[in-house]
């Protein structure tokens, strides 16, 4: 990734995080924009979102993001329009790394416990 795309991705990550903090309904799952990947032509930004909540909440959150993509892009354009000629199209993807890390920690704890019982 070039320095330009890295800077754009970083700015989009910050701004999308702030937008989601204000726009996403309270009382739902915790949404965090963990990464943004931008194409070389800056025409498309893929935002990876970590969602902490139940399976139903995660599904609802992804539906919300996909349904509101156009509105989120519009809000984004009002916030950063002086820095870009064209605002990239947005795509949202769920990042389950946090969930996978918790599962690995649980497995490691159970292995340590089993080793302690067998000693």
Swiss-Prot record:
One of its GO terms (molecular function) is ribosomal small subunit binding. It comes from the Bacteria. InterPro entries: KH_dom-like_a/b, RbfA, RbfA_dom_sf. One of its GO terms (cellular component) is cytosol. The keyword Plastid does not apply. It holds the Pfam family RBFA. GO terms for biological process: maturation of SSU-rRNA. The keyword S-adenosyl-L-methionine does not apply. It is found in: Cytoplasm. SUPFAM superfamilies: Ribosome-binding factor A, RbfA (SSF89919). Keywords: Cytoplasm, Ribosome biogenesis. One of several proteins that assist in the late maturation steps of the functional core of the 30S ribosomal subunit. Associates with free 30S ribosomal subunits (but not with 30S subunits that are part of 70S ribosomes or polysomes). Required for efficient processing of 16S rRNA. May interact with the 5'-terminal helix region of 16S rRNA. Belongs to the RbfA family. Monomer. Binds 30S ribosomal subunits, but not 50S ribosomal subunits or 70S ribosomes. This is Ribosome-binding factor A. The gene is rbfA.
């Amino acid at each position: 990734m070039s320095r330009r795309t890295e800077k754009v991705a970083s700015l989009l990550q910050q701004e999308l995080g702030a937008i989601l903090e204000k726009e996403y309904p309270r009382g739902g799952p915790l949404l965090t924009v963990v990464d943004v990947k931008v194409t070389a032509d800056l025409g498309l930004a893929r935002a990876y979102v970590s969602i902490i909540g139940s399976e139903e909440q995660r599904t609802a959150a992804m539906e919300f993001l996909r349904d509101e993509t156009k509105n989120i892009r519009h809000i984004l354009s009002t916030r950063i329009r002086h820095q870009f000629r064209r605002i990239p199209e947005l795509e949202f993807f769920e990042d389950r790394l946090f969930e996978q890390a918790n599962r690995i920690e649980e497995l490691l704890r159970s292995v340590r416990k089993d080793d302690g019982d067998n000693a």
